[in-house]
């Protein structure tokens, strides 16, 4: 119980601290660029046309809504984080209890020790089920979080309170509205998990010397590196999921010119791939100008 409480508190603290970063990231993913491109230098020192980074973007939001505005969508995100942690922990606890029951079963037969690869498959499968259950239950809060952020673009107030947002989504879209963008999110989580654990197993088994005294430390580093690599490869699923969660929901940020109306998440994927925007929002610094993007300054000139 104490471990669960500490995980919830730690997760909530990290959620609060990272909220401004996620807010900026979501607006960039949707394609909202309120600040015009500038001439800057990339990491190699070459002069390029690039978009303002995280701090300039956050400063722009704060200049309109104040610093408190950077924490828009925090309440549903906290609810999602707390509920997800509890569900994830309960599912894993169920598996642990079933393992203990098998060990203490009648006859107390000694089981064969499974190979390390079988162990990886078993643990990854359990983690996948736990994460998927948590994602499925918390996705409605995730949708509300994204929409409350995206309404900054059109200065709407459609998704302000948690209860009001739930009523609005149910009234306009029904139950399915709470699960907009769920499929690519689940696929991305599952692929990322299996890719991360499989790569970590291969590195730990064939690349690291088991005789090294710092073996456990090296394994933790390899897990972190493979996790980062897996998240980079599966980022398009995150982008598509977030875009589908806000697409055609009655907000300016989910409609043209910021976002086309997608018929499905596959349609969204194909269109982003065609435009070369599959990594949009992945980097918050040294941001290159995306293809075919309309800026706020351009829109003002057209009005």
Swiss-Prot record:
PROSITE patterns: SOLCAR (PS50920). Keywords: Acetylation, Membrane, Mitochondrion, Mitochondrion outer membrane, Repeat, Transmembrane, Transmembrane helix, Transport. Solcar repeats lie at residues 2-98, 118-206. It is found in: Mitochondrion outer membrane. The modification N-acetylalanine is found at residue 2. Gene3D superfamilies: Mitochondrial carrier domain. It comes from the Eukaryota. GO terms for cellular component: membrane; mitochondrial outer membrane; mitochondrion; nucleus. One of its GO terms (molecular function) is membrane insertase activity. Pfam families: Mito_carr (PF00153). Belongs to the mitochondrial carrier (TC 2.A.29) family. This is Mitochondrial carrier homolog 2. It comes from Homo sapiens (Human).
